[in-house]
């Protein structure tokens, strides 16, 4: 039987969070979170416009592609993303397979004026408080990794802390579960996180299910301006892009993508 990569990644993220919690209890993280400047209004930054908006990702590696880029200075890359016209920045904080960290998020937050997303396998409230303490404005929630009650609890906690949940789905059922939380920023990931297989046309099949007041985000399989155009034609308001940016001149690539 193949390994369920999403379950494996989520379990690992929880183990790592428990280790951090042993060194830094929740009360300490809550205190730092409370002292942060208010989160930036991500829904405004990502609101539908004449052209597709881009969430640009700081991404060193992935289970499907292995190492992508060293990125010794995430803040410098984030500044290039901002220069290139990104509307928000995603920072991988998963340590084991994506080679990210909360320190990456903190450095990016200090470097740019754009909303910043914590891209992580979130399954515990401690991780949400960590995100706010590190300066995150958005937090990813993956429907497939969470029971509905926990998904709703985490969604509500993110909102309570002033941040914006990006709720990610991969099937019609998961999309319905995302909408049931009240999320206003919902993504369809072309990559099945259990197998890491891609279905580039998935977003187009699911886009018509979105309520009119929910921002539509297309995730994965964006390698070229043609891919951005494909998602735009299917109804995407926002695309999330990682590999294509970290393996190219990010300013030039963003300019090309934003011209679609």
From Swiss-Prot:
It catalyses: 1-(2-carboxyphenylamino)-1-deoxy-D-ribulose 5-phosphate + H(+) = (1S,2R)-1-C-(indol-3-yl)glycerol 3-phosphate + CO2 + H2O. NCBIfam families: PRK00278.1-1. Belongs to the TrpC family. The lineage of its organism: Bacteria, Bacillati, Actinomycetota, Actinomycetes, Micrococcales. It comes from Leifsonia xyli subsp. xyli (strain CTCB07). The keyword Coiled coil does not apply. It is an enzyme of class 4 (lyase). This is Indole-3-glycerol phosphate synthase. Its EC number is 4.1.1.48.
């Amino acid at each position: 039987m193949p390994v369920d990569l999403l379950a494996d990644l989520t379990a690992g993220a929880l183990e790592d969070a428990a280790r951090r919690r042993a060194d830094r209890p929740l009360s300490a993280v809550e205190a730092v979170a409370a002292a942060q400047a208010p989160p930036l209004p991500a829904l405004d930054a990502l609101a539908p416009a004449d052209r597709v908006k881009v969430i640009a990702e700081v991404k060193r590696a992935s289970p499907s592609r292995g190492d992508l880029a060293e990125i010794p200075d995430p803040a410098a890359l984030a500044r290039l993303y901002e220069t290139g016209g990104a509307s928000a920045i995603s920072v991988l904080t998963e340590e084991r397979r994506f080679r990210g960290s909360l320190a990456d998020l903190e450095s990016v937050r200090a470097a740019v004026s754009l909303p910043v997303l914590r891209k992580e396998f979130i399954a515990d409230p401690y991780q949400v408080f960590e995100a706010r303490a590190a300066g995150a404005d958005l937090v990813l929630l993956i429907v497939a990794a969470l029971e509905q009650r926990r998904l709703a609890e985490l969604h509500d906690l993110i909102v309570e802390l002033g941040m914006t949940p990006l709720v990610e789905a991969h099937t019609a059922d998961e999309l319905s579960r995302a909408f049931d939380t009240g999320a206003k920023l919902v993504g369809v990931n072309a990559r099945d996180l259990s197998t890491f297989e891609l279905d580039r046309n998935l977003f187009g099949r699911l886009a018509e299910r979105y309520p009119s007041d929910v921002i539509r985000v297309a995730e994965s399989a964006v390698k070229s301006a043609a891919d951005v155009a494909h998602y735009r034609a299917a109804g995407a308001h926002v695309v999330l892009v990682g590999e294509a940016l970290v393996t190219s001149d990010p300013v030039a690539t963003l300019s090309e993508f934003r011209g679609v």
